[in-house]
Every structure is written in structure tokens, then in C-alpha cells.
């Protein structure tokens, strides 16, 4: 379902936001050397997915928790909720919100409980905001939520309501897109950076490709530059992923 709805407009949004986030991270790391690369990549991942998912713009920060606690309504609060859930997934899945909000709990856990109780309100606000923004723009915007709303509303208008998604189904799809996309993207980038650190010869291989591009990343256009980044893409989308493989083999059962 996701792949069929991710058109070139969303890919372009991912490209543009990734450039901005990566440049901000690079500037910080150059001036503040230390073991913060993996945490920084997590911040890149969640920010890009927030922008591609529902047009939530966030500045890059060295750690995800550095900016939590300020949002109270709408997309900002929903984004903060998703950020907390991705960091404390087991707690979010297993602990009741009343337990999270106890005074003896950590500030992060109390904040998670506060937001999870209000998630239905946030979701409705996000959907209403996106519908209003789409209506003002005169068509769907370049994010995943806008496409889902457009497809669902078109089915309703054409009398095919049995094929349209309810608001709950749309919010569930957005949640999966955000959380699963964050985990996959952050782990893939983190593994790739660790791989490059362990094998410097592949750094040179990637650098040869990048030397053919403009020195100013701000000038990189998606349609022109992305097709040239074949080595970078090969490193990120490899045939041997960081997770363990599970092979299945058919066999006959004899009675």
C-alpha cells in the first residue's frame, strides 16, 4: 500500500529535507567532534519522515530528547508523540498511561503518558489541518498523509465508499509509516556509517562518486543528482542487510 502511494513528489520532498538535515548535522559534528554520529542520524531519520509523512518541519538536533516537551497541539504534538514512542517502544506498548504519569517516573516517561492519552485528539487535529491545507493548495501536497486523504476522499465522492479509508485507518497507516520507516531508515544509515568506518576502502569508492558533483549541496537537484548516486544507493540498499536473514524452504509432509 505504501509503495503504490509514494510518488516522485514525495521522493523529491525526502531528497530536499535529507539535504537540509544532513548539512545541519555535518556542521554540528565538524564543530563538536565526539561519538554523536548515530544519535544524529536518528534525528535525521525522524525529521525527514515527519516532513515526508505529514509536512512537519523540525530542525536537526544532536539528540531526539533535546527538543521534547514544548508541543501541546496539532502536528507538533503528534510528531513529539511519535518521537517518544520510537525511543520507548516497549514502554509505550506494555505500560498503562496512568502508570507512566506517576510522579516517580522519569520525565520522558511522564511525557509519553501525557501525549499517549491525547493521541486521538492530536490525530484528528492533524487530519483536519492537512485537509484544510490541501483545500487551500487546490490539490494534494507532497506528503504521504495528503495522498492517503486524497485517495480516500476521491473514493467517497465517486460512490466507492467501501474502498475508502476511515480516519482511524488513515491514522494507523500514518503511524506505521512513521515508526516502521524511522526504525528501518535509522538502522540502515547507522549500519552503513559503521561499515564505512570499518572499511576505509569503501569510503574512497563513495568519495570518487561524490567528487563528480557540485561542491555546494544546496544546488543538488533531485532529478539531476539522484540518478548519479549509484554507489551511495548501492551501499544503503545492499543485498546483505544488517539484520539476520531468515530463509524458508518448502518441504513435503508425509503422513
Predicted segments, located by residue:
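Conserved cytochrome P450 catalytic core segment spanning the I/J/K helices
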Residues: 112-188, 251
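Cytochrome P450 I-helix active-site segment
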Residues: 19, 70-80, 138-143, 197-248, ...
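Proline-centered turn/helix-capping motifs that create local helix->coil transitions or kinks
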Residues: 57-58, 87-94, 126-141, 244-248
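Short alpha-helical scaffolding segments that buttress acidic/His motifs in well-ordered protein cores
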Residues: 2, 49, 82, 148, ...
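Short conserved catalytic/interaction loops centered on acidic-Pro-aromatic/His motifs
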Residues: 53-68
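Short, hydrophobic/aromatic alpha-helical segments in well-folded domains
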Residues: 48, 173, 188-192, 235
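Active-site catalytic microenvironments for nucleophilic, acid-base chemistry
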Residues: 51-56, 192-199
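Cytochrome P450 catalytic-domain helical core, especially the substrate-recognition surface
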Residues: 1-53, 71-128, 215-216
